[in-house]
Amino acid sequence: MSEELLSTRPSKRDYNDIEEPEDSHVTVHSVEQDSQHSGEESSTVDALQETEGDVDVIGEDEDEHDIPVMPTVTSSGEVLDESQVTPTKQASSSQPREEIIHGKGESVYSSFPCQVIPETLSRMTRTPPDGEHLEVYRMSNGRLRIYVVDHFKKFSPYSNLTHKPCTVCNRVMKSGEMHLNFPADLDRRRIWANLLGFKYKDILRSKMGPVSFSIAAGPICTEHFAEECFRNHNFNKSAIEAFGVPVAISPDVKTTPSKKSSRVPWVCTVCEFHSCSVVELQTHLLNHTEEMLKKKDNVLDVPEAGFMCPFCRKCTYGYKTISGYRRHLNAGPIHHCHLRRIYEFAKMNCRATELDPAESWDNWTRRNVYVAYHGCEPPANEIVLTPSPTKKAYVQNPEERTKMVHDEEKRKKAVRTLSFVGKEGGTSVNDLNVMQRQVFLQLRREAEINTKAEESAQGTKEQESSQKKHAEEESDDVSELTSHQSPQAPMGSGERRKATRLATSATNSPIKKVAKHEVPATAPSTPAKKRKISHEEEHDPTPESVEREPTVSPNDPRERLRLKERDEQFAKMVQKRSQQVKRLINAKQFKKQEAATKKPRKALAYNLAKGIAATSSTEPEDKVTSSEQTPEPTTSQKFIARNTRSKTKESAVQKVEKPATPVAKPAPVEKEPEERPLKSMLARSFVAGVRPSMAKYQIPLESFTATASLGGGRSLSSGVISRPPTSSSPGGIFSQRVMGAVAQEKGPAKRPSVLSRRPLILSPRKKTSTPRPTLSHHESSPNFSASSPVVVSDEYLIPATDMEVEMVEEVIDSMGNSSSEDVATSSTSSERQPMLTLAEALEMDGSSGTVKDQDMEEISKEMMKDAHYYRAMEDAIKCRTVTKMRADMRLSRHCIRQIEAARARARLFGERTEDYQIFYSNDGAQVLTKKDPKWRELQQQQQQQQQQQEQFPGQGSSDSQQ
């Protein structure tokens, strides 16, 4: 825009608005910035003049560089220090920023604007839509200062009761001054924050100590809103927060530059000229029309489509005469399609003051259009794109002109230069090819990876063979001699092994892949073949060790050091993963217990326990903890079943092994990977059974040895409860596991681990807490005796006297499980009887006559000594929610409520409620009160069955199974 044009109209710029970057070299900005608020108030001047008379809307004309960008004195009178005042600000720091108020105040009542239904506001803003009596003053910079009338007499959501700083510019607002808050709607809050110069993360709540702080909570002063915004929404605070926006540029705000740093210019339709300024192009086109009119002959070559307006859509027709074209260009900007859209968008965002008055072209400068549309200053390094060929000005030659507009080839070419994405105008053929190419590439990549993996697997097998041998030689050698490289290993494997040791992973662990010296590592041998090989190796162990010893001696200390380091590393890994392995072993053990044999084979027990014991006697530091013996009988049971078919072979192996001193040699343990190999390296090492022992690292796993799983009548005192062969009740398993854990727990500080299944309390009640009889409790209720269990066709009665109120759920658990598994186990253990006292109910499936009352008494005494036991149990019980219990047990709501009430009574008053009983039937658990007639029926049925069983004890138990 030219200087002359600027001087023809008074500048209405807000001098406090922009802080011009000092390095800004774009001269267009400094010229055009004079029009930021041109006509900011003109849209409302007429209305104002009725009420206020003459108002100085314009302000004084001042030189561009004397703009005070930030006041040196705040409204509260505090003077800013020199460091805060930039050279530009110092130029006219003598005058404070905004304290000059022009004219007298205007009284306004801010009723809610009628075009909006207030009920729709709740999501947009928290401010109530009520109106207030306001006093409006206009500042010298064109902004408004608004006060709530009588604010000192009443509370108003419009104003702060005290002096508060504005969140945006830190100007301290006076008491009673109107402020606005950020919208409640998150999208609009983000838009406001962007316009007010905040980043998105600034308006998120940040937790500072106990206080949750957010910029979006603070008040915003009226400086940051145009008068247009207040007028549009009738000064109503809630309407402005719901639908208005702050002004594009406001004092002390450096707005974030728009993401759109490139701009497509407007193009002249007559010549090659193009410009980003609407006014410039309009004057340029008017000049064209003047020249055309001046032509003497007045015979003009009118283009085929007519004279086109660059500010209107291409589809609109052109003007056939120059005068018509000129008239159209002189019409106001809002009569041109594209410009009208820009204006409406700006008005919607309360930024139309940048472009007002609507009929004037003067304000449509490059900067103002950008600010009105985007809401912030154009970036200093803005790129002006060259106009595309299709938008090029009309050429004088009509043939060329039609060719340019209608040339299909050109349009196709433009489309082709785009990428091949379908939406962007590329061909679908292209897309298909690309997709296919991608698929082929993917397949090829996978194939390559597979082949590489196979090669590396073969390589590592060889390396691991030598590595494994070294590990075992170390544990074998009595004279503390280890070989530098085993004779069976490939030539360079000694060097390679050093590198591979550190990177040993679960896939190529030394424990899993062991090389045989008869068979090459790559050829996998069948189990039968493997057995033969192992026999051969076992029969002549001595020559090998004899051969080895001479080669070893020279590099002995270094080798030992390296092996020691490797062992330490392995031990660290073991320590880290022992928990997971413990869980894995438990899971496998309990999953496969039915399928597996009752006793692990003796040979296997020997292999691990005695064999490693022998090793540890030779090398004191390689003593084996229970952690290594633990899983053998359980984890490898599947393996035993598969690979060691006959006891004779096993015993043969055992006999040959016994004399040999270096027991833990690679030979006896060579095993092919199973069909479904164990995932972790550690688990595999447990199955393999032999590796450098790690006693000094002490990673204890709770041992569960063969003796523990055998169980006998009196083995109970040791804390292990036996189970009948095929029963798999949770009660039995749990008792086995927990009691084992409790009995074998050495340190008093440790709490027994409560394992994955849900806990069942084995002692009927805490002996210490209540003086009532512990295990003879069933005699206290007249209907029951220990010898005669009562069954009502799958419906059990548990007297409330006989149980801890807290443990009701657990009882129901066990009852539910036992009743569901009744039928499954009936054929095998016909002598088992369902017991109805708590202790017996818990051991329902587990007790095949082995658990006597005295034994139970002993166990419970043992357990009561250990305070940790109850703590662990309670923890485990608390973990399970009532919802889970209900899902498991199908408890009726009523029953749950009753149980909860009973628990609460017990907790509060310590009373034992004996007026109800839990009645578990096929329909789910129910709570029966003694008043219920069904209670009597059940009692009678139980008594009858009791009598029957006394007469025919065998028949009674078989009945109960059905």
From Swiss-Prot:
Record flagged with keyword Metal-binding: yes
Zinc finger (THAP-type) residue numbers: 161-249
InterPro entries in UniProt: THAP_Znf, Vulval_dev_neg_regulator, Znf_C2H2_type
Result after altering residue 246 to L: In N750 and N2240
Annotated keywords: Developmental protein, DNA-binding, Metal-binding, Nucleus, Zinc, Zinc-finger
Low complexity bias locations: 626-637, 939-951
Taxonomic superkingdom: Eukaryota
GO molecular function: DNA binding; zinc ion binding
Residue segments, region Disordered: 1-53, 74-99, 452-575, 612-676, 744-788, 932-962
Compositional bias segments (type: Basic and acidic residues): 23-40, 452-472, 534-570, 647-658
Compositional bias segments (type: Polar residues): 74-95, 952-962
DNA-binding as UniProt keyword: yes
GO BP, sorted A to Z: embryonic digestive tract morphogenesis
GO cellular component terms attached to this protein's record: nucleus
Tissue expression as described in the entry: Expressed in vulval precursor P(3-8).p cells and their descendants, neurons of the head, tail and ventral cord, hypodermal and intestinal cells and germline cells.
Location(s), subcellular: Nucleus
Protein's job: Required to negatively regulate vulval development. Antagonizes Ras-mediated vulval induction. Acts cell autonomously.
PANTHER family (alphabetical): MUCIN 4B, ISOFORM B-RELATED, PROTEIN LIN-36
Protein name in the entry: Protein lin-36
